[in-house]
């Protein structure tokens, strides 16, 4: 287990860790403001390690995530790529999903202080967190279909359960950018605050209330009881990872990234009938091929 002084180590990639303070509150800051806090694979890996350490550290009672500057997180840094893709569809594991599961499995309450725009994994990484507080001025997007891929970070598990299937489908299907106070995001944020600079102070206020007044074991067990009534995020993670592996090989993925970097509308070419046997989703004991529709 890391001691509390190790958290501020310069070894973390573009992350700043404050605390834990006397009340047991630790703050993880995405510190890459020059790139709108876009995530790199080393940042994702470091956050998983930090969560593991804080989970085992009794001096940590609550963990707050926020972004440096005016953005919370603009998603994965597409100029650096998505990291190494697994050797096979069955072995590929989405890096955002690994972070989501680390947050889900962390026994300490986690709070997202979404101080600015959050896009892609920048918003899906917050879905497993206990509480999300957003700036009224923040913009939110789940842009995966606009990049030629599918939802990541087990968000196909979390988002419908947080805001309902109808709104989740709308957000995932359009991939558009919405204001934090949009009705489509109703239920996603516990609070929206103004000005944006008050987002972190408000999150720290809530964290302090939890750290000082709530049983840590009680908080963990209560959350565990809630999730035990649902299907596991591991299932969503495996399905997303296998599908992402296939999509990473596609022309649409190449075009989605290229058009984004060139700041133009994408021209997607992939069609359903062109998908091979690799384009298969497994749902329990049911196999659904993307190459053909099942008969009803």
UniProtKB/Swiss-Prot annotation:
Positions of short motif Peroxisomal targeting signal type 1: 294-296
Under Enzyme Commission nomenclature, its number is 4.2.1.17
List, alphabetically, the InterPro entries matched.
Answer: ClpP/crotonase-like_dom_sf, ECH/Chromodomain_protein, Enoyl-CoA_hydra/iso
Subcellular localization: Peroxisome
The GO terms this record gives for MF are: enoyl-CoA hydratase activity
Q: What does this protein do?
A: Enoyl-CoA hydratase; part of the gene clusters that mediate the biosynthesis of the host-selective toxins (HSTs) ACT-toxins responsible for brown spot of tangerine disease by the tangerine pathotype which affects tangerines and mandarins. ACT-toxins consist of three moieties, 9,10-epoxy-8-hydroxy-9-methyl-decatrienoic acid (EDA), valine and a polyketide. ACT-toxin I is toxic to both citrus and pear; toxin II the 5''-deoxy derivative of ACT-toxin I, is highly toxic to pear and slightly toxic to citrus.
Task: Write the signal peptide boundaries.
Answer: none
- Pfam families of this UniProt entry? ECH_1 (PF00378)
Q: Keywords for this entry? A: Lyase, Peroxisome, Virulence
Which species is the source of this protein?
Answer: Alternaria alternata (Alternaria rot fungus)
The answer on whether this UniProt entry bears the keyword Lyase reads yes
Q: What is this protein called?
A: Enoyl-CoA hydratase ACTT3
- What's the further remark here? Gene clusters encoding host-selective toxins (HSTs) are localized on conditionally dispensable chromosomes (CDCs), also called supernumerary chromosomes, where they are present in multiple copies. The CDCs are not essential for saprophytic growth but controls host-selective pathogenicity. Although conventional disruption could not be accomplished due to the high number of the copies identified in the genome, the high sequence identity among these copies is likely an advantage for RNA silencing, because it allows knockdown of all copies of this gene simultaneously.
Per the record, the coiled-coil ranges are: none
Protein family membership? Belongs to the enoyl-CoA hydratase/isomerase family.
Q: Which reaction does it catalyse?
A: a (3S)-3-hydroxyacyl-CoA = a (2E)-enoyl-CoA + H2O; a 4-saturated-(3S)-3-hydroxyacyl-CoA = a (3E)-enoyl-CoA + H2O
Can you list the GO cellular component terms from the UniProt entry?
A: peroxisome
Q: In which pathway does it act?
A: Mycotoxin biosynthesis
